[in-house]
Each structure stands twice: as structure tokens, then as C-alpha cells.
């Protein structure tokens, strides 16, 4: 009786720790021989009807339980002398407290099932192999949830790498793609230093953006918000698109200026470009390089130079006094060095302001002789046409001073006309 009570006392904590998760499956453990005559487990060689290896592996994978899981469906029967040894072997690899039987005893159970020929009495050989279990430190939480405990330990052991996380850029790109319905390009794996994804605009969006750019180069914020709502884009995308488009426009204008250099210009096309570029140069928007004077034939430049042109009637006398100088200097005996050095501040402005250098009117007209200086009545640039004609009415034949009009305040006009006389070398020196 005392022996049975002792066995029951040993059995009760184990029964409280390990509930029906391991005991309610008699079919799985039916292969183990249990002799009711001696109340002991069949570990001797004639009593080893172990399941086949597939069944054993299924037991290992499904129920990575303790060594006590070998018990059959009648756990309340007090086993004899080997029951204490098994319980001891369950408790020994654990932490030493009452929960060690359920928690830290999983590795010995696996080893005892994987190595059936070993008898259980030498348990000290089993604990060294316990660290081979990958979840050895985790499963001491709940002894009764065998499969649940293993799955929870598997989920806990999952590591979240940085490239798995969703960054702010990726979430914004997903949202914009979903709202705009665009065909987004495949995103590269979003690493910490990944590049910003290029936005793919649809043709309808591009048409609307181009139309808006045609009317307004710079968008105010209310209009930008309106277009963002209209095109299903963000304000930032529209702002960046306009920035890029302005840069492209500037490059196109620069390329046009290089193409329309005086060496490749025709007379009918040069005067408008020359007049426009002359007024822009006088308003101080361009550096003193004559080749760049074509870059900005824009209406605001004309508006800036209008006040200077309206006051030209007062300068008819200096212009008339310039006429003999022009006739005198029109001969080709002048050396070209002031043109290369641009002769100081006002001379650079003269070089830019006059379509003689910029537009190239006189390159074709002055080649025969100095007389064709007076042929410029039909080549007047449009922006200063009204003032030029008033000057020409007062001083007949002086309309060639139209190039002087944008800068009438410079008193030393002789330098200007001498630079006009050196026109035949202008393309060679300024556009090499």
C-alpha cells in the first residue's frame, strides 16, 4: 500500500502537468507493449513492438513531447519500479522544479524515441544531447499544449529582416499606384539605400500636364492641388514634373540658340531673333557672350526694354551725329581685337544689344560695301519698330541705328560703330 501510495504521489503532479494532449491518443501509442501483469513497460528485447520508422517520425514531428508520453491510455495505473525511474528521467533534464517534467523534458523524449534500443535507466547520458533541439529554451511555458507549443515556438523563432518591413516610401508608392491606376514598374527590394521609384505617368496625365505647362511655366499651389486631385497624383509629383519640364525647356531653347547661330542664319530669319535677343541682353538677363543671346526671346524681356525704347526721340541728335562716324568706320580696315575683348562693360552690352552681332543682319548686308548699311528699313526688328520708324522719319537713311536703340544712354557711341564696322569677322571670333 505504501508503495502504491508513493507511486500515486509521484503520478499526481505529472498528471496535473501533462494533461490529455498525450494521453488521449491510444492509437498512436498502441504499438508499445504494456504488460498488465507486472505493471511495467516492455523495454526488454522480447517486448519491443515499436512502430515502423514512418510512424516514429510522425510522432517526432507531430508531438515533440516528453519521455512520459510513452505512457498508454491508462495513466492512473501506478506503474511499478520503473515508473519512478521514468518520472525521474522526465524531471532530471528539466529545470528541477515541478514543471521540468513537462518543459525541459522534450529533448530526452525525442532521443528516447529515436533511439529505442537504449534502456531508460541510464538517464545522465541523455541531458547532454538536449541542446540539439532547436527550441530547447522556449518550450518550458505550457506543458499541456504539445502541438500548440511547438507552433508557437516556431512563430517566435521567426526573424523579421529589414527588407521585410514596409517603409514609408513603399507604402506611399502602393497607395499612389492603387489610386491612379497606373502601370507601376516592378519595385526592387526596398533596402535601406534603395533608389526612389520612378513614377510612370499615363498618356492622359502627360497631356494634361503639357497643356498646363504651355500656359503656365510655374504653378501656384491652389492650381497644383487642383491638378493633383484631377490627375490622381500627389502635389510633389506634379511639382517635380514641372521642375523637370522647365529644365527640358531651357535645354531646348539653348539648343535652338546654338542651331540659329549667325553662321547658319538666313537674312529673313535673323532680324526678329536679333531684335529679341538685343532687348533681352540690354535688360541684363544674359551673360556677355554673343552666342547665348538667342536663348531667351521671351515676351517679358520686351516688356523690360520698352521704357528705354520710348525715350529714343530725345537721342536723335546723337544718332545723327553717329552717321558720319558710321560711314567713316564702315570700311574694312579695322582690326578685330576689340571684338574679342568686348571692350569693357558698355561695349559688351553694345555687342549683345545690337542685332549686328547677335542677329547677324550686317553679316550679309555689309559684305559688298559700306553702302548697304542703309538697307535696313525692311529688316527692322518688331519690338522696337514704332520708335525706329520715328527716328527714321526724322533722320532719313539713319535707320541702321536701330541696333543702338536699346542702349541710347551710352555716350561713347563711336566705340559701338567701330564695333559695327568689324562685323565681317564676327562669326569667326565669337562662335569658334
UniProtKB/Swiss-Prot annotation:
Keywords attached to this entry: Developmental protein, DNA-binding, Homeobox, Nucleus, Transcription, Transcription regulation
Gly residues bias locations: 97-106
Protein name (record): Homeobox protein Hox-D3
Organism: Homo sapiens
Single GO BP term: anterior/posterior pattern specification
Keyword Transcription: yes
Localization of this protein: Nucleus
DNA bind region: 194-253
Primary localisation category: nucleus
Source organism phylogeny: Eukaryota, Metazoa, Chordata, Craniata, Vertebrata
Family in the record: Belongs to the Antp homeobox family.
Motif (Antp-type hexapeptide): 160-165
Keyword Transcription: yes
Amino acid at each position: 500500500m505504501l508503495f502504491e501510495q508513493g507511486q500515486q504521489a509521484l503520478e499526481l503532479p505529472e498528471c496535473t502537468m501533462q494533461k490529455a494532449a498525450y494521453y488521449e491518443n491510444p492509437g498512436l501509442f498502441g504499438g508499445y507493449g504494456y504488460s498488465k501483469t507486472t505493471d511495467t513497460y516492455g523495454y526488454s528485447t522480447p517486448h519491443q513492438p515499436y512502430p515502423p520508422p514512418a510512424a516514429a517520425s510522425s510522432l517526432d514531428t507531430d508531438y515533440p513531447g516528453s519521455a512520459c508520453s510513452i505512457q498508454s491510455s491508462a495513466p492512473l495505473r501506478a506503474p511499478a519500479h520503473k515508473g519512478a525511474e521514468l518520472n525521474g528521467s522526465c524531471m532530471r533534464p528539466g529545470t528541477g522544479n515541478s514543471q521540468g517534467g513537462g518543459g525541459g523534458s522534450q529533448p530526452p523524449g525525442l532521443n528516447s524515441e529515436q533511439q529505442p534500443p537504449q534502456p531508460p535507466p541510464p538517464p545522465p547520458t541523455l541531458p547532454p544531447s538536449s541542446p540539439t533541439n532547436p527550441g530547447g529554451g522556449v518550450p518550458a511555458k505550457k506543458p499541456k499544449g504539445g502541438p500548440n507549443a511547438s507552433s508557437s515556438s516556431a512563430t517566435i523563432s521567426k526573424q523579421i529582416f529589414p527588407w521585410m518591413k514596409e517603409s514609408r516610401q513603399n507604402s506611399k508608392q502602393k497607395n499612389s499606384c492603387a489610386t491612379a491606376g497606373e502601370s507601376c514598374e516592378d519595385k526592387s527590394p526596398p533596402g535601406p539605400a534603395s533608389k526612389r521609384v520612378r513614377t510612370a505617368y499615363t498618356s492622359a496625365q502627360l497631356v494634361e500636364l503639357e497643356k498646363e505647362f504651355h500656359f503656365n511655366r510655374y504653378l501656384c499651389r491652389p492650381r497644383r492641388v487642383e491638378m493633383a486631385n484631377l490627375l490622381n497624383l500627389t502635389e510633389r509629383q506634379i511639382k517635380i514634373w514641372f521642375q523637370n519640364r522647365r529644365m527640358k525647356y531651357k535645354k531646348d531653347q539653348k539648343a535652338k540658340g546654338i542651331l540659329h547661330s549667325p553662321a547658319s542664319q538666313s537674312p529673313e530669319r535673323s532680324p526678329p531673333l536679333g531684335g529679341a535677343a538685343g532687348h533681352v541682353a540690354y535688360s541684363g538677363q544674359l551673360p556677355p557672350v554673343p552666342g547665348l543671346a538667342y536663348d531667351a526671346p521671351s515676351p517679358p524681356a520686351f516688356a523690360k526694354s520698352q521704357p528705354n525704347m520710348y525715350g529714343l526721340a530725345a537721342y536723335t541728335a546723337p544718332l545723327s551725329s553717329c552717321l558720319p562716324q558710321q560711314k567713316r568706320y564702315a570700311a574694312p580696315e579695322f582690326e578685330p581685337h576689340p571684338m574679342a575683348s568686348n571692350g569693357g562693360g558698355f561695349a559688351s552690352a553694345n555687342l549683345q544689344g545690337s542685332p549686328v552681332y547677335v542677329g547677324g543682319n550686317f553679316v550679309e548686308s555689309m559684305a559688298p560695301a559700306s553702302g548697304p548699311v542703309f538697307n535696313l528699313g525692311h529688316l527692322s526688328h518688331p519690338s522696337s519698330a514704332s520708335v525706329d520708324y520715328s527716328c527714321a522719319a526724322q533722320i532719313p537713311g539713319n535707320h541702321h541705328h536701330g541696333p543702338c536703340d536699346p542702349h541710347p544712354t551710352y555716350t561713347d557711341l563711336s566705340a559701338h560703330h567701330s564695333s559695327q564696322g568689324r562685323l565681317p569677322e564676327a562669326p569667326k571670333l565669337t562662335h569658334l
